[in-house]
């Protein structure tokens, strides 16, 4: 396997959807909402992808200021390519793009919660989420 990693290489919303469908992430993303998925792909300012030839097999999709914080919003690896270090490499390359003081932040999927501590992340119990239908009171 000769994996090629690319930084900010354009991908289509359809390629992104197909990858999510072949990973575990589609369960938690609106893959049936093409407009939303297009917005997710087109408005990310840091995307690292993994390719096996012409086949997209992994993605780390982030929003960042490159100096203080980088939110890694999606990390997906095709199920046939999992447990080969691709996800870890996507994160390493993402971190490589950031300034020396920039933190990498993510919300772990329930099944992946223990994985992130194993590769060096520290758990932060102070995270809060305001859902789309929730309102500031």
Language-model segments: residues:
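Short, flexible, glycine-rich and Lys/Arg-enriched loop motifs at helix boundaries
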Residues: 5, 98-101
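Alpha-helix N-cap/helix-start capping motif
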Residues: 10, 66, 109-110
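Conserved active-site alpha-helix within GNAT-family acetyltransferase domains
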Residues: 100-106, 110-136
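A short helix-loop-beta-strand connector motif used in the catalytic cores of GNAT acetyltransferases and
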Residues: 38-49, 102-103
């Amino acid at each position: 396997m000769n994996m090629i990693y690319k930084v900010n290489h354009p991908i289509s919303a359809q390629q992104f959807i197909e990858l999510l469908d072949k990973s575990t992430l589609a369960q938690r993303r609106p893959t049936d909402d093409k407009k939303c998925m297009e917005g997710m792909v087109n408005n990310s300012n840091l995307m690292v992808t993994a390719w096996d030839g012409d086949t997209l097999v992994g993605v780390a999709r982030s929003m960042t200021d490159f100096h203080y914080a980088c939110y890694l919003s999606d990390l997906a690896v095709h199920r046939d390519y999992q447990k080969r270090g691709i996800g870890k490499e996507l994160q390493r390359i993402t971190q490589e793009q950031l300034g020396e003081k920039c933190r990498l932040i993510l919300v772990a999927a329930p099944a992946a919660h223990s994985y992130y501590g194993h590769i060096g992340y520290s758990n932060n119990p102070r995270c809060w989420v305001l859902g789309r239908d929730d309102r500031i009171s």
